[in-house]
Amino acid sequence: MEFVTAGSKKIKVQHDSWMDGGGTWFGQEYIDIIQQRYPDRVFEKCYEWCSGPAFIGFGILDQALCKSLCVSDIYADAIKSVEETVRVNFLSNVSAYATGTVAGLPEHEKFDLVVANPPHFLECPGDDNYQRIAVDQDWAAHQEFFKNIGQHLLPGGIILLQENQAGSMNREKDFEPFIAKAGLEITAVIDSPQHYTPDHYTQIYYIEIRQK
């Protein structure tokens, strides 16, 4: 399957249907949020955590909001899709890693923008495929992310995570202890203009995080 980004290059993102955890839907709102919050800024390197086939990252790259892109995902098949996207679109400014942890990234990888549509739920009904995309038990993946991402942030770097209040019912407060322990701080919380619907399973919001 192909998902075509909306920028000038119209990057053809290669993927299987099971890999889409919302990246082709509410994930594409990232473009507007970044353009509105950081007007006229072009980031040196964007990192998409829990990338899947990198619908979000390739969209940001195609809109020229970053000069280069790094992605990682626990599933090797997702990273193979990223590599195929790089090949068919003749891209030379993308790095991709099959790892389930930020600690698994090479030390040299540094970013000034970090984005993600990570697993949003501690638990939720659904088949095995949905479970592996949607569930982060005990927020273990989030805890590991916050613990290790700081060493990869460039000065002035921004973390902008896309979360779902239907899963993190206390919103950013569910993650505040992990963020503070890592020497980071929340600088903004933004409700999705298009995909925040109270009492619905899509209650998307964004957490902006920076180094203290």
Give names to the regions the model predicted.
Residues 26-107, 113-116, 122:
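Conserved SAM/SAH cofactor-binding pocket of Class I
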Residues 141-194, 199-201:
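Conserved Class I SAM-dependent methyltransferase catalytic core
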Residues 118-144:
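Mobile active-site "lid"/loop adjacent to the S-adenosyl-L-methionine
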Residues 19-27, 49, 138-142:
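Short, conserved glycine- and acidic-residue-centered signature motifs
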Residues 19-20, 78, 167-169:
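Alpha-helix N-cap/loop-to-helix initiation residues
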Residues 200-208:
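Short hydrophobic/aromatic beta-strand or adjacent loop that forms the aromatic wall/cage
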Residues 1-38:
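Class I SAM-dependent transferase core
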Residues 76, 80-83, 88, 104, ...:
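Class I S-adenosyl-L-methionine-dependent methyltransferase catalytic core
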